[in-house]
Every structure is written in structure tokens, then in C-alpha cells.
């Protein structure tokens, strides 16, 4: 008897208040890295109606106009009118950055602390995941949820649907049979819109112009579409909800298809393993699947603050592995340097590449800056596995 179930993931657009905060935090990081690639940055952002607050810990010699970076990020997203709840020209921006604690710094700085190698910036556990449900080796539900809100942004910015506003959320429910996605049961898209628009016009445009162009037609035969199910979505963005950095960690990763260690990414330089080790985990898992060692691969990595080597590395392939999980884990340790310094070098992370990651997912995007999406280790892994 076939095993059937439904699985759901969501995404949000770049105009969602939490994503506005994430993008400001990563824009700050990039602006600093353009001058000082070895800076220590933990940039947090809060945005509300007409207000942006920048706080956190930054140690750098870079001279950055943080207020202007925040304003230009808000402008790029599309909040250029006070009627939208926040306007880059008139919003207040408060800056309250401190420097990194010297107690933390001595554990992270190479040559300082008990472990003379560059230690992890904190304790914690991180997960990486990949599967063969999409060409990008991502879970299908989060992949299509991202593509829907990405399409919403595209049609808003190029003027084809000029009544769209920046804030939007998508949700995709997939039907699985024996562990494989076969169709889409439900798609939800809530999109902010101009006040004069009628619901029926919004619904038709969303289904025909946003959803159908980015989702496989064969998966839409019996799909239920829920477009702005409250009936109206005019007040949105930071006016509708206060936005905070780091509140969309499942959207940022695998849409709930894999565990999450709890650490957010945006605004953090790669000495923070919350970010860099999660990127390394994706790199490892994607290469395992690309090598044909498994159909699904999940890796957990953990660290102690100030210590370079991971405290644990575990690989799970959910019964899909061509060799044992223990053997794959051994190959991972042989082919990937998972010390913080090794990750930074392996993935070339001391670059101003992070603002692009802060909307539409950190994983599963074939962007040239996203070094963790490379599959350049797959051939060596396959050979070492004897396949």
C-alpha cells in the first residue's frame, strides 16, 4: 500500500518586515567587508512604522555610513512612499553598535586563547541538507515557495503588475507518495496591493501571472489556490508587523524539511559558525547527493566556543545511501575542512556577498557568489566511495 502524506513550506518576499531587517543587517555587513574583510560583525536590525534601529556588536576599522546603507536598502526593496508604512527618505534610523566582547575575541582570534587556531565564535549545532527532489538538490516545497515570491517581486519591480506592493508570503503544500513529491495540494499567496484593487482581479493575476509560470504544470491539476484569503492586504511591511533580524530561519534554510540548530545568519560575519558552518553543511550535503552517494543527505556539525575542530559530525541518509552513513561521515572528514578557518578558506567567505542571501533563501540558488552551492567535491567523493 502506498504511503501518502502532505508536506508544507513557506517563503516570504524581500518586502516582508523580517526580511527588510535581514537585508539591512547583511547590507551593513557587506559595506564593512568592502573595506575590512576581517571585521567582526553581529548587526541586528529592528524596523517598524517609520523607524529603523541598528544595534549589535561591530569591531572594524571601516568607515561606514550605517544610516545611508539602511536607507538605500529600504529604497532598493521598494519602500519609497510613506503610504507603504516606511519610506527610505523620511524614516528615522537609530544606531547603537558596540564592539565585540574581548572575552569572545580571544577565543576567535588566531593565536589567542587556549586553542591557538581560530576557534568557533560560539558553541552550537548546525545542519546541512540536500535531496534530489529538484535540480538544485533542494526540497521541492521550499524551492517553489521561494520562486513564487521571487516572481511576485519581479512583476512588481518591472511594472507588469504595478498594483503590487513589497510585502508578500507564499506557502506550498506538496503531496508525497512513497517519499516522492507527485503534485501540489495547496498554494497560498498573500500579497500586499494597492487599495483600489478588487480581490477577483488580484486572484486572477496571481494565479496566471505569478504562480503558473514558475510551478510545473503537471503538478497543478487539482491544486487549491488561496490568494489573499483574508480578502484584503493593503497595510503591510514594517507598518503591519515589526521586523527583526533572524526571525525567518526556516525560510532561510530548508522550509522545515531538515532540522535547524537555531542560529540565524544575517548580519553575522563568517567567524560566527551559526552562519559559516551552516553554509559548509549545505556544501557537504549537496556534494554527497551530487556524487550519487545518497538521494537525501543531512549533516549535523557542532562546535564549542574558542575550539577549532568540531565537537561532532554526523551524517544521515535516511536509508538512501549507497554506502553506510558512518563511511560517508568518514569521507566528509577526509575531504572537507570543517574548522572555522578552513570553512572560510574553502568557501571564500571574506567577501561582500551577503545581502543577496538575505531574501529568497540562502540555499538552492545558482548564484556565482554562493560558493556553498558548488558540487566540485562530488567526483572525488564518488571515487573515494568506490562507486
From Swiss-Prot:
Enzyme superclass (EC): transferase
Co-factor: note: Binds 2 divalent ions per subunit. Binds 1 potassium ion per subunit.
Keyword Magnesium: yes
Signal peptide per UniProt: none
Catalysis performed (reactions): L-methionine + ATP + H2O = S-adenosyl-L-methionine + phosphate + diphosphate
Pfam families named among the record's database cross-references: S-AdoMet_synt_C, S-AdoMet_synt_M, S-AdoMet_synt_N
Annotated GO MF terms: ATP binding; magnesium ion binding; methionine adenosyltransferase activity
NCBIfam families named among the record's database cross-references: metK (TIGR01034)
Protein's name according to its UniProt entry: S-adenosylmethionine synthase
Organism expressing this protein natively: Janthinobacterium sp. (strain Marseille)
Amino acid at each position: 500500500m502506498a504511503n501518502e502524506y502532505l508536506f508544507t513550506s513557506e517563503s516570504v518576499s524581500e518586502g516582508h518586515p523580517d526580511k527588510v531587517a535581514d537585508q539591512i543587517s547583511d547590507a551593513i555587513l557587506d559595506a564593512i567587508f568592502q573595506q575590512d574583510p576581517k571585521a567582526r560583525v553581529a548587526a541586528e536590525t529592528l524596523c517598524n512604522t517609520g523607524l529603523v534601529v541598528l544595534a549589535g556588536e561591530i569591531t572594524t576599522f571601516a568607515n561606514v555610513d550605517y544610516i545611508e546603507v539602511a536607507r538605500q536598502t529600504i529604497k532598493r526593496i521598494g519602500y519609497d512612499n510613506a503610504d507603504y508604512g516606511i519610506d527610505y527618505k523620511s524614516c528615522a534610523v537609530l544606531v547603537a553598535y558596540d564592539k565585540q566582547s574581548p572575552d569572545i575575541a580571544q577565543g576567535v582570534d588566531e593565536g589567542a586563547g587556549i586553542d591557538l587556531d581560530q576557534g568557533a565564535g560560539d558553541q552550537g549545532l548546525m545542519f546541512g541538507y540536500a535531496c534530489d527532489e529538484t535540480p538544485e538538490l533542494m526540497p521541492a516545497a521550499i524551492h517553489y515557495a521561494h520562486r513564487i515570491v521571487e516572481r511576485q517581486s519581479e512583476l512588481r519591480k518591472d511594472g507588469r503588475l504595478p498594483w503590487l506592493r513589497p510585502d508578500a508570503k507564499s506557502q506550498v503544500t506538496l503531496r508525497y507518495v512513497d517519499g516522492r513529491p507527485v503534485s501540489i495540494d495547496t498554494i497560498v499567496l498573500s500579497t500586499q496591493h494597492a487599495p483600489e484593487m478588487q480581490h477577483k482581479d488580484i486572484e486572477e493575476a496571481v494565479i496566471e501571472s505569478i504562480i503558473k509560470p514558475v510551478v510545473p504544470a503537471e503538478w497543478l491539476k487539482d491544486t487549491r489556490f488561496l490568494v489573499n484569503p483574508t480578502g484584503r492586504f493593503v497595510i503591510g511591511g514594517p507598518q503591519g508587523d515589526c521586523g527583526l533580524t533572524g526571525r525567518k530561519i526556516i525560510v532561510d534554510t530548508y522550509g522545515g524539511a531538515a532540522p535547524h540548530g537555531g542560529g540565524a545568519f544575517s548580519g553575522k560575519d563568517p567567524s560566527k559558525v551559526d552562519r559559516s558552518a551552516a553554509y559548509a553543511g549545505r556544501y557537504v550535503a549537496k556534494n554527497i547527493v551530487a556524487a550519487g552517494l545518497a538521494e537525501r543527505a543531512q549533516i549535523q556539525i557542532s562546535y564549542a566556543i574558542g575550539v577549532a575542530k568540531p565537537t561532532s559530525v554526523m551524517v544521515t541518509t535516511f536509508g538512501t545511501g549507497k554506502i553506510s552513513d558512518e563511511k560517508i561521515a568518514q569521507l566528509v572528514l577526509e575531504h572537507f575542512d570543517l574548522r572555522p578557518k578552513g570553512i572560510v578558506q574553502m568557501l571564500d567567505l571574506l567577501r561582500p556577498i551577503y545581502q543577496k542571501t538575505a531574501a529568497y533563501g540562502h540555499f538552492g540558488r545558482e548564484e556565482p557568489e554562493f560558493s556553498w552551492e558548488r558540487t566540485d567535491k562530488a567526483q572525488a567523493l564518488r571515487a573515494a566511495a568506490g562507486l
